[in-house]
């Protein structure tokens, strides 16, 4: 209460005692220190706290000192409330070079990570790449050396090349699995039992060769019809070349028959070649029984059709598969290799093809020699045996007695039709040394 009364008495003092000379020392101090810093303000605060002590010591100068210190305290409050760039005189007096240095430090301190990551990282996070999940899968499979990848291999490729998916591992892996199973461009290939590891492989479907990744949308797109036709033409030429080699390899695995002569002749129509002549294929398939009956081998070398096993039945496919091939081998064994087979029309059977067919009989009859006879008027089988011994492609000839006990044991495991064929040949043609 005493303080309030003292303050009221101070306000009631007449202002006639106020003089300009009392303000002169403060003006001089302001000229010496035109812009005080924060440190001076902090040093003047204890003087503001000592006002009650000076109030009792110097009663005549109380109003002047109190008003000046109140103004200074108001200035301090205003400067502290304002941001440092505007109200702080120390900050406003910084030269332009210092401001540039401060800005550079801020960029290097916080935003400098974006320069290290190639501009993909903004505000501490990577941007999502503008590619669909199908495009990411296709990129991963196409860059692999074997053009196939497992599911983990696809994950590793995406996380290695796109850091966004390395930081955000939730959700996108399920999307990758769904796109692999739903999109027809991707085919699942089972792992081979010799291949170590887990999981199936994923490959691109051959029909997806014309699929590319759009540059603007990042989605899969197909090429136009013209470019697609060119790709189909190239793909067809490639498949035909590989298909021929595959059929050649497959044919050598199942049946060592020469591809130049087949029992089932292709039913191709007669076409003109480039020089205007007709092709070697007839318009109607010619049965091989007629081919064999046109040669002049004699009655001993002609096949009988009364024994139930004729060449017509061979061609028509009425004989089982194993009997068919074995009979074909026996058929070739009984035909002289060097014999030309004349045929009517434009169809002619090359003797080389007959030689190739006869050479295949070693597959079933390894002990049977392959004769090489050039004369059609040969009458004795001894001359044939002598000529076959001089043939370069025939193996070493064995005596006829060594062949006789081997044939019954071989024919016992054959079907009824072929065994009848061998017994008929043994009974009917006694001069044929190839069978008995």
UniProtKB/Swiss-Prot annotation:
One of its GO terms (biological process) is nervous system development. A neural-specific transcription factor that can act as both a transcriptional activator and a transcriptional repressor. Both represses and activates neuronal differentiation in a dose-dependent manner, independently regulating cell fate choice and cell proliferation. Converts ectoderm to a neural fate. Suppresses the transcription of the cell cycle inhibitor p27xic1 and promotes the proliferation of neuroectodermal cells at a high concentration. Promotes the transcription of p27xic1 and inhibits ectodermal proliferation at low concentrations. Residues 1-12, 96-128 have a biased composition (Basic and acidic residues). GO terms for molecular function: DNA binding; DNA-binding transcription factor activity; sequence-specific double-stranded DNA binding. It is found in: Nucleus. Pfam families: Forkhead. Gene3D superfamilies: Winged helix-like DNA-binding domain superfamily/Winged helix DNA-binding domain. The keyword Membrane does not apply. Residues 1-63, 79-129, 375-402 are annotated as: Disordered. InterPro entries: Fork_head_dom, FOXG1, TF_fork_head_CS_1, TF_fork_head_CS_2, WH-like_DNA-bd_sf, WH_DNA-bd_sf. This is Forkhead box protein G1. At late gastrula and early neurula stages, expressed in a narrow stripe at the anterior end of the neural plate. At later stages, this stripe of expression thickens and expression also appears in the lateral margin of the neural plate. The anterior line differentiates to show expression in the forebrain, anterior (nasal) retina and olfactory placode, whereas the lateral cells form neural crest cells that migrate in the first branchial arch. In tailbud stages and tadpoles, expressed primarily in the neuroepithelial cells of the telencephalon. Residues 44-56, 375-397 have a biased composition (Low complexity). Residues 128-222 bind DNA. It comes from the Eukaryota.
């Amino acid at each position: 209460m005493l303080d309030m009364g003292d303050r009221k008495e101070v306000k009631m003092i007449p202002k006639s005692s106020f003089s300009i000379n009392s303000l002169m020392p403060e003006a001089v101090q302001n000229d010496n220190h035109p812009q005080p810093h924060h440190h001076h303000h902090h040093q003047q605060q204890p003087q503001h706290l000592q006002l009650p002590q000076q109030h009792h010591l110097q009663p005549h100068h109380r109003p002047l000192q109190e008003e000046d210190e109140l103004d200074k305290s108001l200035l301090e409050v205003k400067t502290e409330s304002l941001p440092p760039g505007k109200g702080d005189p120390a900050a406003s007096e910084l030269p332009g070079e210092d401001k540039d240095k401060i800005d550079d430090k801020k960029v290097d301190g916080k935003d400098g990570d974006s320069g290290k990551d190639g501009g993909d990282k903004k505000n501490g996070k990577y941007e999502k790449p503008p590619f669909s999940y199908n495009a990411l899968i296709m990129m991963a499979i196409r860059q692999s050396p074997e053009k196939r990848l497992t599911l983990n291999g696809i994950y590793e490729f995406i996380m290695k090349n796109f850091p966004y998916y390395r930081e955000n591992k939730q959700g996108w892996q399920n999307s990758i699995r769904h796109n692999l199973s739903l999109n027809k461009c991707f085919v699942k290939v089972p792992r081979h039992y010799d291949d170590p590891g887990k999981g199936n492989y994923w490959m691109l479907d051959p029909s997806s060769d014309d699929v590319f990744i759009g540059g603007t949308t990042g989605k899969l797109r197909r090429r136009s019809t013209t470019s697609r036709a060119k790709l189909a033409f190239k793909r067809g030429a490639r498949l035909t070349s590989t298909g021929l080699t595959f059929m050649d390899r497959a044919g050598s695995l199942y049946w060592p028959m020469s591809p130049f002569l087949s029992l089932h002749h292709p039913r191709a129509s007669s076409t003109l070649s480039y020089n205007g002549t007709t092709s070697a294929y007839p318009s109607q398939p010619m049965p091989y029984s007629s081919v064999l009956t046109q040669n002049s081998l004699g009655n001993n070398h002609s096949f009988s059709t009364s024994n139930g096993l004729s060449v017509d039945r061979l061609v028509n496919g009425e004989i089982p598969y194993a009997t068919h091939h074995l009979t074909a081998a026996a058929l070739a064994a009984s035909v002289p290799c060097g014999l030309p087979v004349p045929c009517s029309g434009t169809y002619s059977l090359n003797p080389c093809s007959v030689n190739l067919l006869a050479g295949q009989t070693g597959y079933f009859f390894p002990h049977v020699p392959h004769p090489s006879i050039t004369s059609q008027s040969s009458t004795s089988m001894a001359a044939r045996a002598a000529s076959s011994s001089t043939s370069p492609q025939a193996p070493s000839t064995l005596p006829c007695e060594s062949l006789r006990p081997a044939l019954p044991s071989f024919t016992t495991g054959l079907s009824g039709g072929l065994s009848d064929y061998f017994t008929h040949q043994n009974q009917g043609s006694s001069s044929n040394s190839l069978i008995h």
